[in-house]
């Protein structure tokens, strides 16, 4: 389950506006704004929620499930490339 707070936090980590998320997910900006205005689980149509989540995950954000410590987001650790000599 992804919450609207996680979506907002993910946008903040990425430095994205609602317009940026809309463009990258293929969802209209008014839809992003409407979905973010409702507290709780990300609602709307299932396909819309999947597009939003996929855009954010594709940009390197991991969603952290509620596990007693609270749900959240974090940036994926980038793999280090070793230089070859």
Question: Can you name each region flagged by the protein language model?
Answer:
Residues 1-12, 50-53:
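A short, Lys/Arg-rich alpha-helix, primarily the initiator
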Residues 6, 31-34, 55, 72:
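Residue-level recognition of specific faces of alpha-helices
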Residues 7-20, 82-83:
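Short basic helix-loop element that most often maps to the first helix and adjoining turn
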Residues 8, 41-42:
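A generic secondary-structure micro-motif detector
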Residues 12, 26, 37:
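Residue-level detection of the helix-turn-helix DNA-binding "recognition helix"
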Residues 17-34:
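Short alpha-helical DNA-recognition segment
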Residues 25, 39, 46-63:
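DNA major-groove recognition helix of helix-turn-helix/homeodomain DNA-binding modules
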Residues 54, 58-85:
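Short, charged recognition helix plus adjacent turn
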